[in-house]
């Protein structure tokens, strides 16, 4: 780490033993060890932070949205120009280019696309389960003829007199 050899460490320990004394040497060695551990953890966390910021920077560079937007617009312009050339060359109607140039979407107001499907009409009266189709048609004929009422005796002249 500090490029210190084994002999140099022994020389430093002998000098520290003479200066500090044998009684306080274990306590100082513990404090130096704690300081070295904190220093290593700090250096490792700084390396991780620099790697994280470098990764974030790489992601931002790869996601350069403005450049991608410009590329997409240039492709769109190229396609529009090519389509115009083909349109002029083959004499295609102007209605085909309408989706590119239209400001408002066209509405399909009178077509089948706007009409909702109609629901089938269900009979409102309940029929008895014993009736057969033949008897039910005869009954409907009877009811339809009996529903027709006779003309009333009142005339428009008599209603005006009252």
Swiss-Prot record:
The cellular location(s) given in this protein's UniProt record come to:
Cell inner membrane
For this protein, the record's Pfam families field holds: TatA_B_E (PF02416)
Keyword Cell division (UniProt)? no
Sorted alphabetically, the keyword list is: Cell inner membrane, Cell membrane, Membrane, Protein transport, Translocation, Transmembrane, Transmembrane helix, Transport
The record's annotation in InterPro entries points to: TatA/B/E (IPR003369), TatB (IPR018448)
Q: What is its main location?
A: membrane
Coiled coil regions, renumbered to chain = none
Cellular component GO terms, alphabetically?
TAT protein transport complex
Its GO biological process terms? protein transport by the Tat complex
- What spans are recorded as compositionally biased (Low complexity)? 123-135
* Family annotation (Gene3D superfamilies): 1.20.5.3310
Q: Where are the transmembrane segments?
A: 1-21
Q: Where is the composition biased (Polar residues)?
A: 108-117, 147-162
Where do the segments described as Disordered lie? 86-162
Q: Name one GO molecular function term.
A: protein transmembrane transporter activity
Its placement in the membrane is given as: Single-pass membrane protein
Q: Which family does it belong to?
A: Belongs to the TatB family.
- What function does the entry list? Part of the twin-arginine translocation (Tat) system that transports large folded proteins containing a characteristic twin-arginine motif in their signal peptide across membranes. Together with TatC, TatB is part of a receptor directly interacting with Tat signal peptides. TatB may form an oligomeric binding site that transiently accommodates folded Tat precursor proteins before their translocation.
> Quaternary structure per UniProt?
The Tat system comprises two distinct complexes: a TatABC complex, containing multiple copies of TatA, TatB and TatC subunits, and a separate TatA complex, containing only TatA subunits. Substrates initially bind to the TatABC complex, which probably triggers association of the separate TatA complex to form the active translocon.
Protein's name in the database? Sec-independent protein translocase protein TatB
Species this protein is from: Hydrogenovibrio crunogenus (strain DSM 25203 / XCL-2)
């Amino acid at each position: 780490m500090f490029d210190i050899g084994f002999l140099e460490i022994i020389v430093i320990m002998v000098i520290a033993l003479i200066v500090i004394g044998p009684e306080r040497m274990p306590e100082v060695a513990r404090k130096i060890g704690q300081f070295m551990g904190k220093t290593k953890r700090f250096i490792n966390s700084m390396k991780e932070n620099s790697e994280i910021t470098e990764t974030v920077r790489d992601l931002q560079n790869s996601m350069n949205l403005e450049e991608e937007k410009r590329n997409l617009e240039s492709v769109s312009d190229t396609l529009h120009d090519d389509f115009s050339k083909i349109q002029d060359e083959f004499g295609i109607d102007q209605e085909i280019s309408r989706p590119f140039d239209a400001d408002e979407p066209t509405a399909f107001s009178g077509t089948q696309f706007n009409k909702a499907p109609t629901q089938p009409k269900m009979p409102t009266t309940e029929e008895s389960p014993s009736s057969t189709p033949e008897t039910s048609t005869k009954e409907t004929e009877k009811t339809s003829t009996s529903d027709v009422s006779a003309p009333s005796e009142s005339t428009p002249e008599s209603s005006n007199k009252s």
